[in-house]
Amino acid sequence: MILSRRSVLFAASGVALGAGLFLTLGTGARAQTPLSDLLARTHIHGLAVDGQDSGRLLIATHHGLHALDLDTGLTVRLSDHSDDMMGFVADPVAPGGFLASGHPARGGNLGVIASSDGGASWAKLSDGVNGPVDFHQMDISKADPSVVWGNYGGLQRSRDGGRTWEQVADAPLGLIDIAASARSVERLYAATETGLWVSDADARDWQRAHPTDAPVSFVEVMADGMIHAFILGEGLLRRDEDGGAWEQLHPDFEQRFLLYYAADPVNPDRAFTATQLGEILTSDDGGRSWRQFGTD
């Protein structure tokens, strides 16, 4: 089985900014939409608990960035920017700061875009190498947030928050997701069709981070250095970057694959995940038990 966020399997799921092209500006109140209606007409490309309001889950989609009110179950698009948002990632030290990539509605690639106001407005930071890039995988280093990784024609790295980029190395075969370390600026994790890998040499040399060669549909590193990954046949696992055994948090999601994972930075026991079935699951015990959002 070939697993990729671009595959048919997953298709149902994929600070002042200075001078730049502003893609959109917020224009006040917008219509609210039940989560079920939003998910029926789009698919998810990323999740983040709002660092400015932990009562909201931010959902990057094929049609812009939306905020889910966790009390009401209603969503609202945060700006007029309704383009396909790939590689969505929250800044680990600047609440309200985000990076994304993807495709504009008119076609082509976005390059790297950024928001510093919670997603209300976006500015283009860079075309990347051989761009405009379309980073389907992107992550900000928790060890040094000025370092950003992306994958487009190989792994690219920025050392200045996404403004300039260099081509670093070929991506591992069958790459599905990447996650930057919270311990070392040189360390990068790769979820692939043949297992979970780690490089401590700026993506130039790779070793297995988990012994199985089963597909891994996502990998995420928390600010405290805890790695989370979903491994086919094993479920949701976690382990500290500093070592120790892998802990199986939840083995059986029936026919679901977890594509994206977000934990509340204030309360890490509260977590959210998106599946290939186009649904959002929520946990209040650090990932040991899950329920579909809105079914309480």
Model-derived segments and spans:
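N-terminal secretory signal peptides and thylakoid transit peptides that target proteins
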Residues: 1-19, 23
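Short coil/turn segments at the loop-to-beta-strand junctions that recur within blades
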Residues: 81-86, 129-133, 171-176, 212-217, ...
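Asp-box/BNR beta-propeller loop motif
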Residues: 34-35, 63-82, 109-127, 156-168, ...
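Residue-level detector of Asp-centered blade-edge/turn motifs that repeat once per structural unit
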Residues: 51-53, 92-95, 142-144, 182-184, ...
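Beta-strand-rich domains and repeat architectures in extracellular enzymes and scaffolds
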Residues: 36-66
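Short, solvent-exposed loop/turn segments at conserved positions within beta-propeller repeat blades
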Residues: 104-109, 150, 231
